[in-house]
UniProtKB/Swiss-Prot annotation:
<dbReference type="GO" id="GO:0009073">
    <property type="term" value="P:aromatic amino acid family biosynthetic process"/>
</dbReference>
<dbReference type="GO" id="GO:0000166">
    <property type="term" value="F:nucleotide binding"/>
</dbReference>
<keyword id="KW-0520">NAD</keyword>
<dbReference type="InterPro" id="IPR016037">
    <property type="entry name" value="DHQ_synth_AroB"/>
</dbReference>
<dbReference type="GO" id="GO:0009423">
    <property type="term" value="P:chorismate biosynthetic process"/>
</dbReference>
<feature type="binding site">
    <location>
        <begin position="105"/>
        <end position="109"/>
    </location>
    <ligand>
        <name>NAD(+)</name>
    </ligand>
</feature>
<feature type="binding site">
    <location>
        <begin position="129"/>
        <end position="130"/>
    </location>
    <ligand>
        <name>NAD(+)</name>
    </ligand>
</feature>
<feature type="binding site">
    <location>
        <position position="142"/>
    </location>
    <ligand>
        <name>NAD(+)</name>
    </ligand>
</feature>
<dbReference type="InterPro" id="IPR056179">
    <property type="entry name" value="DHQS_C"/>
</dbReference>
<dbReference type="Pfam" id="PF24621">
    <property type="entry name" value="DHQS_C"/>
</dbReference>
<feature type="binding site">
    <location>
        <position position="184"/>
    </location>
    <ligand>
        <name>Zn(2+)</name>
    </ligand>
</feature>
<feature type="binding site">
    <location>
        <position position="151"/>
    </location>
    <ligand>
        <name>NAD(+)</name>
    </ligand>
</feature>
<keyword id="KW-0028">Amino-acid biosynthesis</keyword>
<dbReference type="InterPro" id="IPR030960">
    <property type="entry name" value="DHQS/DOIS_N"/>
</dbReference>
<keyword id="KW-0862">Zinc</keyword>
<keyword id="KW-0456">Lyase</keyword>
<keyword id="KW-0057">Aromatic amino acid biosynthesis</keyword>
Length: 368
């Protein structure tokens, strides 16, 4: 087992990465201080893993209740969130009740938001079961739900007590979900570590096959990068914004296509290709770097051709973004591979990227 630390002073917490962790009651013991625990999971993950976590908590003498939500980004809204609140209130949960997020990014975001709001804040633990959640969304304390007009526009910063990432859970991931997680792995290399990016390029085939040793290394390095950024800028006042590389375009794709049509990681992957193109148009990265980002994204089985929403629609959607100020869209671009920054861009260059993004090269099969 590997243990990292997210250094936030009194609110610091560990990230445990390894195998067989779902059954490890001793990992949970320091972080479940009250008598009651509520596991929040979904219809896909619950039947696979909930009983194991329930048993670990019961071994600590805790009273355990499990809430099962519908699965998917399309259910990341108020109505589903209220199901968590209903369960907490019906169970008589108090301020020492610990919530346990057992699932992917949607479960983690919603459980964290429920923990932030219930009685103005209760503790929670992240137990991510998807690659995307293990390398990205479970770390850093961002929680929230979607609104029909924008992704993650309603939420709060609420740090978990611990992140417990059991690599074994990745074995049950569908190939599409694994690819979605690889988008965030690639992102971390692109924005912060060119050497790591090269390592991903060299190992993309076994990573796609979910090689356990390589996957553990990828989760570790991605968590190191994200934890380092969060420790410097917890609430996205500056540096942390670089973690949104590909997300401004990606969120527009998700909203424009309807939440759930594209997985979050698929949209981010395509968004990174678009952001790399924009970085190149503005003279920051060379043609080779732009091509490497596109080729690695495609090699990870992610879409590299954007849906044809129309430039005006893309721009409208991107203005509903947490980084936007006074209607001005801000993008995370690359100065070079491994170094990102936030900036506004000329409208003509943005529209050129949007026009280029929907073009399918003659030799490329259409992307679904």
């Amino acid at each position: 087992m590997i243990t990292l630390e997210v250094d936030l002073g009194e609110r610091s917490y560990p990230i445990h990465i390894g195998t067989g962790l779902l059954d490890n009651a001793e990992l949970l013991r320091p972080h479940v201080r009250g008598q009651h625990a509520v596991i929040v999971t979904n219809e896909t993950v619950g039947p696979l893993y909930a009983a194991r976590v329930e048993a670990a908590l019961a071994a600590l003498g805790k009273t355990v209740r499990t809430v099962t939500l519908p699965d998917g980004e399309a259910f990341k809204h108020w109505e589903t969130l209220n199901r968590i609140f209903d369960a907490l209130l019906q169970a008589g949960a108090d301020r020492k009740t610990t919530l346990v997020a057992l699932g992917g990014g949607v479960v983690g975001d919603m459980t964290g938001f429920a923990a932030a709001c219930y009685m103005r804040g209760v503790p929670f633990i992240q137990m991510p079961t998807t690659l995307l959640a293990q390398v990205d969304s479970s770390v850093g304390g961002k929680t929230g739900i979607n609104h029909p007009l924008g992704k993650n526009m309603i939420g709060a910063f609420h740090q978990p007590n611990a992140v417990i990432a059991d690599i074994d859970t990745l074995r049950t991931l569908p190939a599409r979900e694994l690819a979605a997680g690889m988008a965030e792995v690639i992102k971390h290399g692109a924005i912060a570590d060119a050497e790591y990016f090269g390592w991903i390029e060299r190992n993309i085939k076994p990573l796609n096959a979910c090689d356990p040793d390589l996957m553990a290394l990828a989760v570790q390095r991605s968590c190191e990068i994200k934890a380092g950024v969060v420790a410097q800028d917890e609430r996205e006042g500056g540096l942390r914004a670089i973690l949104n590389f590909g997300h401004t375009f990606g969120h527009a794709i998700e909203a424009g296509m309807g939440y759930g049509a594209w997985l979050h990681g698929e949209a981010v992957g395509c968004g990174m290709v678009m952001a790399a193109d924009l970085s190149h148009r503005l003279g920051f990265i060379d043609t080779e770097t732009r091509a490497r980002i596109r080729e690695l994204t495609q090699a990870a089985n992610l879409p590299v051709v954007a849906p044809e929403l129309g430039a005006d629609r893309y721009i409208e959607l991107m203005k509903v973004d947490k980084k936007a100020e006074a209607g001005s869209i801000k993008f995370i671009l690359l100065k070079q591979l491994g170094e990102a920054f936030i900036t506004t861009v000329p409208d003509a260059d943005l529209r050129a990227t949007l026009a280029h993004a929907v073009l399918k090269p003659p030799t490329e099969a259409p992307v679904a």
